[in-house]
Amino acid sequence: GKAERKYAGVTHIDVANLDSVKADEILQYCKKKNITISALAYYPNVLDEDKECRKKSIDHLMKVIQASALLKINLVTTFIGRNKNLNITDNLELAGNVWKPILEYAESLNVKIAIENCPMLFTEDEWPGGKNIAVSPAIWRELFKRLPSEYLGLNFDPSHFIWQEMDYIRPLYEFKDKIFHVHYKDIRVDKEARNEVGVL
């Protein structure tokens, strides 16, 4: 379907009904327009405390992974997620359990998963703590320990480090082999607003 957002890049591929014929049509269209798709993006909360929402998100993520293989992209960008009722340690344990079968499926199709570092705490339903725990090098290390897969890496977005007042260059050295995809966009820090409400 067509997205409701009013900026570019959000009209979606219907992964639920994608088959090899439709995938080939998309690839031919991209070739004709001289563009490539770097990744399929899907950003749900697969650690949601609502187990029905969690299952729905995981089921669709599996379809996105399959579509990425059909389209010969072999990369999906997403969030690890967060259960807002749990602390970070318990969320890490939950992530290990929830993501293991997702990664096994991705590996079976030769599709890599790149986790974005956006905290997702911008709206009332995302507060407090946001909907994604994978926001910092300290947490990445723990995730990669619990999920030691060559198919799990990062969709690195330096803008989220900037507004959190973190060094966005330093992680590039330690995690260079885990950076599968990069989001580039501009950012402006509103210092007056930050002085009023802080970075969280």
Whereabouts are the PLM-identified features?
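N-terminal pre-domain/capping segments
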Residues: G1-N74, T89-K100, E107, K145, ...
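Flexible loop residues that form catalytic
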Residues: G1-A3, N45, G81, C118, ...
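Substrate-binding cleft and catalytic face of glycoside hydrolase catalytic domains
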Residues: S38-D48, T77-N85, V111, M120-F122
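Acidic/histidine-rich catalytic cores of soluble enzymes
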Residues: L40, D90, G96-L200
